[in-house]
Amino acid sequence: KDMLLFPGFAKSFHVVATPRGALRVAPVTMADVLVIQNKGGGHGEIGFHLAQQLVSRGDAVTILHEGDGPNPKEAHRAYGELPSDVKVIWGGDLSEAAACLAKLEGASFSSVVDNWSKSPEAIAPYATAAKAWGVSNYAYVSSAGMYTPNKGDYGAVGEECAVKSSGQRQAEEKIAEMGLPFSYFRPQYIYGPAQGKSYLAFFFDRITRGRPVPVPNGGDQLVTMTHAADNAAMIAAAVGNEAAVGEAFNCATPSLVTYDDLVRLCAGAAGMECEIAHYDPAGFDKPDG
């Protein structure tokens, strides 16, 4: 991995949705949706936007949230903006699935969006509950980090690309083996105004302090940056949508920028000039700490 930026930053491929994986928008029925939401990281803002979008079209939304309550992170502070009829249940340790499911007090749901599980062991009890409820769709948000393009390959990576057997890939396989009507969503780099983990904060920090921004190699590698609300819109389109069942979707914008251009966009947003310093990641020794 290349250092100083964010994991995988200097990889020379990006994900795009292929025609085979394009989400066909079909009429959807109103749903009772359970969103299983993690407490932060790159996925931390998705649940907020997803709840807003689902409620706006008439769905009922319950968020089973990791953690004991709101913390100072941006995504949690934004929850005050959610409609009052969005029910947020703080589940504590979601790996204690029996206790967390008991907090639902016997409620059942027609669709589940799992934005928390990262292993087959984690997803299994929630998938078992979903199967008992007879859900029309179990939308699982995994990661585009599972793709393993051939060494030397450049350009777009579609859903048919080979994947490694990561915990998230095994979770995908688990819900398929269980016979659930699944949809997989594989986001890459996510940003947004309430992001708990900002991939862009490093750039803004360097730019606003007048420091050079280190960019690996020549800076002409392409990357996708997708707004959390757009990720949520793709996922929301699958809820209650039979056309989405059994499909994997790259959850990323088709708009591509180079790493150098991404730094310049950040500088423009900050109203400042920027200096880019290219470096060879292969010859860089990461300091300890």
Over which residues does each language-model region extend?
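Flexible, glycine-rich beta-alpha linker
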Residues: 185-204, 221
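Mid/C-terminal beta-alpha module of Rossmann-like enzyme folds, strongest
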Residues: 232, 237-289
